[in-house]
Swiss-Prot record:
Name of the gene this protein is made from: rplO
Organism: Xanthomonas oryzae pv. oryzae (strain MAFF 311018)
Ranges annotated as biased composition (Basic and acidic residues): 1-12
Biased composition (Gly residues): 23-33
Name under which the protein is recorded: Large ribosomal subunit protein uL15
Record flagged with keyword Ribonucleoprotein: yes
Spans annotated as Disordered: 1-61
Bias kind Basic residues: ranges: 34-47
Known partners and oligomeric status: Part of the 50S ribosomal subunit.
A GO BP annotation: translation
Cellular compartments per GO CC: cytosolic large ribosomal subunit
Classification via NCBIfam families: rplO_bact (TIGR01071)
Length: 147
């Protein structure tokens, strides 16, 4: 048998008629039309529940306590570890020099030196905050800190 365009038809069962609901009890889907009795799912627009809604029970996001917050100061301040300063040339160190050396990300608005490791070079910090331990280490290496 040759295949012709006018003989083409979908496979058996590939295209079924849509089920008509609510058209008498003889159909098996009359009266409640497969939606059950009452409740939100039986209604028009039913089943569309807001995220977090738990049926009137106090929702999880209200049952649990609020905890913590993200400090804007911490977000805008970059930490620079003291041993990373050795990547720079000895001398004056300010925020611009730290950014040029890629020690401070572009989103940061200020920097703070934190003590970790040893310092071998003499630095003069200008306009950069430092912890008490970092100040002591810089001064012990012969440098100074100017706020």
């Amino acid at each position: 048998m040759t295949l012709r365009l006018n003989d083409l038809k979908p496979a058996d069962g590939a295209r079924t008629q849509r089920t008509r609901v609510g058209r008498g009890i003889g159909s098996g889907l009359g009266k409640t039309a497969g939606r059950g009795h009452k409740g939100s799912f039986a209604r028009k627009g039913g089943g569309k529940i807001k995220a977090g809604f738990e049926g009137g029970q106090t929702p999880m996001q209200r049952r649990l306590p609020k905890i913590g917050f993200r400090s804007k100061m911490a977000r805008d301040t970059a930490e620079v570890l003291s041993y990373q300063l050795d990547k720079l040339d000895a001398g004056d160190v300010d925020f611009v020099a730290l950014r040029a050396a890629n020690l401070v990300p572009s989103r940061a608005k200020k920097a703070k030196i934190v003590l970790k490791g040893e310092l071998s070079k003499k630095f003069v910090l200008k306009g950069v905050a430092a912890t008490a331990g970092a100040k002591a280490a810089i001064e012990a290496a012969g440098g100074s800190v100017e706020e």
